[in-house]
Amino acid sequence: VPDRGLFVVADGMGGHAAGEVASEMAVRGIARDLTAAHGASLDETVGRVTAAIRSANAAIFERTLVEHDKRGMGTTATVLILHGNRYLIGHVGDSRAYLLRDGVFHQLTKDHSYVQEQVDAGYLTPEQARTHPYSNVITRCVGASGDVVPDIFSGTCRANDVFLLASDGLTGMVEDDALAAILKAQGSPEKWVDRMVSEANRRGGLDNITAIVVRIDEVDAPTPDGVTTQDVPASQR
């Protein structure tokens, strides 16, 4: 829902197209709940992002209990909300949110994955994790159990910030340095997304690829009542 400053990437898992069902349920449910909450304060929005992801989780999990062909389905969910001059991210799984600011490419989220846990424990390097046979094993997702707790991140937007939300179909094929180079090149969000998808496919394109790029062209100074506005071009694929 770009006109409301709401962006969601969900990457489903499960056989017989169940993953697509899970990801669609997550996107629709989260978008519905957060669009209805438009106009809430930042503090209220934090709670509503958490509630929206947990609600989507419950709906997906309940469906797995009554439809045998949907058992085991689930999805990642990475949500970006632009709220005045602030951004808010809700995150479950191994899709990622990045921020390119002043030429520096930051990964804002941390993967909920087996290999990330091994990296955190010092058993694997990030380079080893990329090619590990269990690199696609996630430890937290939406719909796998009765409840889920999302990670929440927030910060202040600046003019010329560029956000990237992406599934592991992109980040597993294209290294961060290459993604950053694409975003630093001349172009628009639409062209950057096209280049990223083309590069992932050129390298083998082993998984579904989902990417959203959001560029903050302008962040107005807060008005006396605290309201700010933004010009936010976005592209997704």
Descriptions of predicted regions:
Residues 1-237:
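PP2C/PPM-type serine/threonine phosphatase catalytic domain
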